[in-house]
């Protein structure tokens, strides 16, 4: 009887040891970077007041007419870009503010007076340039790049007076450059526009263009390095016309 008890205890210890070893192996597997983590080019950083998405090393395009589906695994960030002119039931490129380039095709949108400029991405370049530079727009289109028009928030390190009234408090977002890097930057909380600009300048932003915001227009999403998608602001209408797509 005593011998049988000893054998039983030995068997129990062996099973426990094997089980413990299996758990260690499972843990190691969980810590192995996923395919998304290995190829995740966007970097996300936060400050006290800002969320900064570094998209310097990412591929960019401008989606028009239909917002990319949140299930598209290769999309790591999708946010509204240029202003939409009118709330229409059907899509028209002429309802997007200013010249814009989507999938390498140049379209002319509606015109609006003010301090507007263009952000473009092509051939691994990301650049801001003044509205009216037709040669540059055609260069971007020939290279199958992307571009959209928006108003200056910061130009050459100085705050810019926006052409639209921005006295109310809300979430604000811009596309920006500093120290050779390109970012999409959003306020963490509802703030005044002047405070948002102040935060950007304190972070050393040199140039920045506004991105369409406001209730419903700010609906967007991003995907973290594990592949999980997160909705940024709820969807309240179907009138948005164009989105910056980051892959």
Model region roles, listed by residue range:
Residues 4-13:
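Sec-dependent N-terminal signal peptides
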Residues 20-111, 185:
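Zymogen propeptides
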Residues 83-84, 214-216:
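Catalytic metal-binding/acid-base residues of hydrolase active sites
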Residues 88-161:
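Active-site-adjacent helix-turn-beta-strand microarchitecture at beta-sheet edges
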Residues 149-179:
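Conserved beta-alpha junction segments in alpha/beta enzyme cores
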